[in-house]
Amino acid sequence: MTMLQDPGRKYRPFPPVNLSDRQWPNRTITHPPRWLSTDLRDGNQAIVDPMDAVKKNRFFDLLVQIGVKEIEIGFPAAGQTEFDFIQGLVHSGKIPDDITVQVLTQARKDLIQRSFESLEGARAAIVHVYNAVSPAWREIVFRMTRDEVKQIAVGAAKLLRDEAAKRPDTDWHFEYSPETFSTAELDFSLDVCEAVMDVLRPTKERPLILNLPATVEAATPNVYADQIEYFCRNLPNREAAAISLHTHNDRGTGVAAAELGLMAGADRIEGCLFGNGERTGNCCLVTVALNMYTQGVDPGLDFSEIDRIIETVEYCNGLPVHPRHPYGGELVFTAFSGSHQDAIKKGFEAQEMRNDELWRVPYLPIDPADLGRTYEAVIRVNSQSGKGGFAWVLEQGQGIKLPKKLQADFAHHVQRLADELGRELDADDIWRTFRKAYYLDRDGATFELVDYEETRASDGTRLFTGTITVGGKHQQVSGRGKGLVSSVLATLQQTFGLEIEVLDYFEHALGKGTDARAAAYLECSLPDGSTVWGVGIDEDVATASVRAILSAANAAVAVEV
């Protein structure tokens, strides 16, 4: 079977919500929602090998460290393993006083009772009950009328009320989900939720959580936002309800739907770290939280050590975090493209020069350092990279700040190596290539400095006297000029017949303090009009310039050969 030329014969577009005066498009997110992690329930039921108790406890500890205050810890009626874990956690003393655990149950008497039993001994807990309300479920799965489906919800609400009353030592809270809300009629969802509220009698001080799930994402995020706003505007006693969102990612817009849902009036978000969950996954709590953070809103969740968080999540779920996953992926802060690298490099340079803390670096919506990432991986070099890439790598790794024209010269060496190897070049590759290209090592060097002296003559000129190796043999040399650079150039001309003219000179410190070294760069012209570059590095800035001249001399000899 192949894709249809006319998919309209098989699929129908989702009907829009009649909400001509919608308000959510004009709103912004200015404060964080209540966060509920369902990693230990929805996330766990969606992995090939569900977590054992060791992994669940490790994941729970991680969520506590991040700052999640509401954690769904399981589906106790699913089996003895789930029940035992929940009971064990409740009695372990590991649940901080400011964290409320939650369990999920279907709207059946025996399952609800079992759920309350699993939470006996808890300081505070949320019991979350659900039943599906959409036409497909009513007509195909249950074969029930609207009223029959509503009575399931009402009966479940009465059980929540009565079971909680039997256990007054726990601070009980309730959550109701009209499952499949996003594909159900809004008037019916409102009718069912109002009936549940009539039973549980929530107040503004103790609201009922009404969770409105996109159980299967069926429309664009704006439609979901319309549904949420319509529901919020038409729910009686709205202040006694905390509107919660549980989006899925079937159409790839679970995060967007959750964000627009917040703008539409929701108070709470359910999801998983890095979007784990059934099918294409749940809303990613990391993405939503850090989206807020990059808009200047404190999400109340701490992802300062994101690599450690990823390590734990991957271990517990047995699933890798995609390298392109927003904020957490291995490659999300990495640029290979030359133009991107150049923009990022300039952005960092400008950031250092400004006196304000405002983050403005092209291609990086967040400072990687805020998440515990280093800058070394921001720019990586391959055959697609430009000058900005390797220049950044050298500066970050070695403190080398290449002049623009030297970047262009070195680019030929980097490009040639990248083409030869056919892979990404790491920092060691680039540093090794740089040292070889500018004769910072003995390999391939005709001239190498051993030692020297500079003296001042009575006429004001400078005399350079030194020992250099030429072809591996020591040779005493000397020359006179107006300064150190010119005296070394005179030495090369008089002793070896090398005519080199300095066109430009740059120097800077490598590091700070008394242990700082110096780097010197010389652009030089040869008699035939070609140019060569010399690079010198030494503890002493004067010696660095001498080494740079000999580096240029080595390049000149190589050109002649």
Explain the meaning of each model-derived region.
Residues 1-109, 373, 378-381, 385, ...:
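N-terminal capping/small domains of soluble enzymes
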Residues 2-41, 296-478, 514-517:
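A mid-to-C-terminal "edge-of-domain" accessory segment
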Residues 4-6, 11, 35, 51-70, ...:
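Alpha/beta enzyme core
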Residues 21-26, 32, 44-50, 55-60, ...:
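Non-catalytic terminal/interface segments that mediate subunit docking, oligomerization
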Residues 42, 46-47, 76-80, 134-136, ...:
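Short, small-residue-enriched loops and turns at beta-alpha junctions
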Residues 137, 212-214, 242, 270-278, ...:
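Short beta-alpha connecting loops at secondary-structure transitions
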Residues 216-353:
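Catalytic alpha/beta core domains of metabolic enzymes, predominantly
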